[in-house]
Swiss-Prot record:
Cysteine pairs bridged by disulfides in the record: none
One Pfam family per UniProt: VWA_2
TM spans (from-to): 18-38, 67-87, 309-329
Keyword Transmembrane in annotation: yes
A single Gene Ontology CC term: plasma membrane
Protein name: UPF0353 protein MMAR_2288
Organism field: Mycobacterium marinum (strain ATCC BAA-535 / M)
Record membrane topology: Multi-pass membrane protein
Entry keyword annotation includes Cell membrane: yes
CDD domains per record: vWFA (cd00198)
Organism lineage string: Bacteria, Bacillati, Actinomycetota, Actinomycetes, Mycobacteriales
Keywords recorded for this protein, A-Z: Cell membrane, Membrane, Transmembrane, Transmembrane helix
Length: 335
C-alpha cells in the first residue's frame, strides 16, 4: 500500500531479511526495561511509611509513563523493517523492446461503417499509439494485403512510422500468415543488433485487421495465420490482435456491394495460439482505447523496487513522538 507523505509500504520481498534478527535485540531491551521497572518498584516499597513515600515521590500519570518507552521500541521495530529492505512492484518504461505494428490494407478497409472509413481511422489511431508509446521502444510497421511489406524497420524514430502510416495504399487479398512471418523476421533481425542484455529484447506483434484471411484460405496451411501464430508462440512473441469494424460493413467493387463483416473469431484464435490478447473495436474511440491499453501493457515493465523509505519515515515520526511523550509525560527522555 501507499500512504500519503510516507510512500509505498510493503511487508514482502525483503532483500536483507537477516536484519530481522535485530528483533531479538529489541526484545532484550524490552526485557531489561521491564526488569528495571520491577526493581525500581521493589526499591520504592522498602519505605515503611507509605504516607511519607507519597509525599516525597513526584506526581506522575503512572498509567501513561510507559508510553515513551513503548513508542521507542516501536520505532526500533520500524527501523528494523526498513533495514530488512522490503520491496514492491514498480512500473518503469521499457528501454529495450521491439513492437511490430502490422496493419491490414486489403480492400475491405475501404468500408465506411467506421467514419470516415476503416483505413483512415486505423491510421489516426496508429499514429496516436506511436506518439504515446514509451520512447525507448523500437517500433516497426508492416502493411499487408496479398503480400506483406516492411515499411519501417523497428526504430525509436516515431516520425518515420507516422510518415509511413500516411502513405498506406489499398491492395487485394489478405495474407495474414505471411504478415506475421514477416514481422517475426523483422523482430529477429533487429534483436540480433540491439544490445543491453544476454537475451533477445522482449517483442510483441500488434496485428490490426478487419477480415478473414483469404490467402491461403486454410489458416492451418504452412503459410496460414494459425501456423504463423504457433510459430510466434514458439519464439516467445505474443500477438495482440485488434479486429476493427462492424458486422455491417460493405464496399463497392465494380458497382456491386460486397459485405465485409469484421471477423472476430479468426483474430481471437490467432491471439490465443500465440499467447497474446485479442481486442475488438467498432469505433475510432474504441480503437483509441484499445491502443491506450496496449501502450500500458507494452510500454512498461514491472520490477521490484525498494520500499524501505516509507518505513524509515514512519520510524522517524514514531521516534519523535517518543521523545515528545517523554518530555510531556515524564519530563525526561525514556530510560
Amino acid at each position: 500500500m501507499t500512504l500519503p507523505l510516507l510512500g509505498p509500504m510493503t511487508l514482502s520481498g525483503f532483500a536483507h531479511s537477516w536484519f530481522f534478527l535485530f528483533i531479538f535485540v529489541i526484545a532484550g531491551l524490552i526485557a531489561v526495561y521491564v526488569v528495571l521497572q520491577l526493581a525500581r518498584q521493589k526499591r520504592m516499597l522498602r519505605f515503611a511509611n507509605m504516607e511519607l513515600l507519597e509525599s516525597v515521590a513526584p506526581q506522575r500519570p503512572s498509567r501513561f509513563r510507559h508510553i515513551p518507552a513503548m513508542l521507542l521500541a516501536l520505532s526500533l521495530v520500524l527501523f528494523t523493517v526498513a533495514m530488512a529492505g522490503p520491496t514492491h512492484d514498480v512500473r518503469i518504461p521499457r528501454n529495450r523492446a521491439v513492437v511490430m505494428l502490422v496493419i491490414d490494407v486489403s480492400q475491405s478497409m475501404r468500408a465506411t461503417d467506421v467514419e470516415p472509413n476503416r483505413m483512415v481511422a486505423a491510421q489516426e489511431a496508429a499514429k496516436q499509439f506511436a506518439d504515446e508509446l514509451t520512447p525507448g521502444i523500437n517500433l516497426g510497421l508492416i502493411a499487408y494485403a496479398g503480400t506483406a511489406t516492411v515499411l519501417v524497420s523497428p526504430t525509436t524514430n516515431r516520425e518515420a512510422t507516422k510518415a509511413a502510416l500516411d502513405k498506406l495504399q489499398f491492395a487485394d487479398r489478405t495474407a495474414t500468415g505471411e504478415a506475421i512471418f514477416t514481422a517475426l523476421q523483422a523482430i529477429a533481425t533487429v534483436g540480433a543488433v540491439i544490445g543491453g542484455g544476454d537475451t533477445p529484447p522482449p517483442a510483441r506483434i500488434v496485428l490490426f485487421s478487419d477480415g478473414k484471411e483469404t490467402m491461403p484460405t486454410n489458416p492451418d496451411n504452412p503459410k496460414g495465420a494459425y501456423t504463423a501464430a504457433r510459430t510466434a508462440k514458439d519464439q516467445g512473441v505474443p500477438i495482440s490482435t485488434i479486429s476493427f469494424g462492424t458486422p455491417y460493413g460493405f464496399v463497392e467493387i465494380n458497382d456491386q456491394r460486397q459485405p465485409v463483416p469484421v471477423d472476430d473469431e479468426t483474430m481471437k484464435k490467432v491471439a490465443q495460439l500465440s499467447g497474446g490478447n485479442s481486442y475488438n473495436a467498432a469505433t475510432l474511440a474504441e480503437l483509441n482505447s484499445v491502443y491506450a491499453s496496449l501502450q500500458q501493457q507494452i510500454g512498461y515493465e514491472t520490477i521490484r523496487g525498494d520500499a524501505s523509505m516509507g518505513w524509515l519515515r514512519l520510524g522517524a515520526l514514531v521516534l519523535v513522538a517518543a521523545a515528545l511523550a517523554a518530555l510531556l509525560i515524564n519530563r525526561r527522555l525514556p530510560t
